[in-house]
Amino acid sequence: IKPWLHKPGQMPLTPPEKYRSDDCLWFFNAIPAYVAETGDLGFYRKVLPYSDAGEDTVLAHLRRALQFNLDRTGRNGLPSGLAADWNDCLKLGYRGESVFVAFQVRLGLATYADVAHRLALPDEAAWAQRELATLDEKIQRVCWDGDWFIWAIGEDGTVFGTHRYPEGQVYLNTQVWAVISGAATTPQRDRCLDTVRERLATEWGAAICDPPFEKTPVAVMRAVLFNPGSKENGGIFSHTQSWAVLA
């Protein structure tokens, strides 16, 4: 994904150390919204170039976006965090896992299965449903902390966003995306959103996490570089408020 400069079919490859785990998954928010607005289901069959070379249908671009994250997973089989997920301060690498991206992948798989069904592509729909069932099992086994969903798992196995870790126990993104993606069961949905209200809600909006980071190693969580209550260290982001509203 090239958000700032894009010459289709002519861009240099992104070096692996700069891969971001969330970038290609925003297609699953943007493209279905475009198709719903225009009514043009045929857009999924339109052939468009890749960033560097080659071309394929929009649907194939979506499949490739999913495969990118399915091919890069950590010790629990959840998506790798890579250079960053949406949170630029979170440095998880290839072995650390992003629960936020797991929810993005879940939404992507569910969307892909629905689109493939509507395009009369049963094999593609079945593939997505199988991957979805596998991911759901991993999410339920690894990511629920009792009252909310965890944030991430570091390369060394440290769990962030758990009641057992003293900082950043509750993370807004994983609560609201658990609901948006459909990963949360009904009891989980109700409880994690109650936790958002109890722990993150302020008169100015929902904070991104609570409590802020003060002692967590900076190599993994660069939010610790910011004052508590600012930016990714417990600040209030306009972008995340919209997700909370959707949830």
Language model features: what each stretch is:
Residues K2-D23, S51-A53, T57, N76-S98, ...:
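Carbohydrate-binding/catalytic loop surfaces
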Residues E198-A201, G229-N233, L246-A247:
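Non-catalytic C-terminal accessory modules of carbohydrate-active enzymes
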Residues Q104-A223:
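Catalytic cores of carbohydrate-active enzymes
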Residues I1-G77, S98-R106, R189, G235-A247:
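Aromatic-rich carbohydrate-recognition surfaces in CAZymes
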Residues W26, P79-S80, W177, T195:
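Generic structural signal for residues positioned in beta-strands
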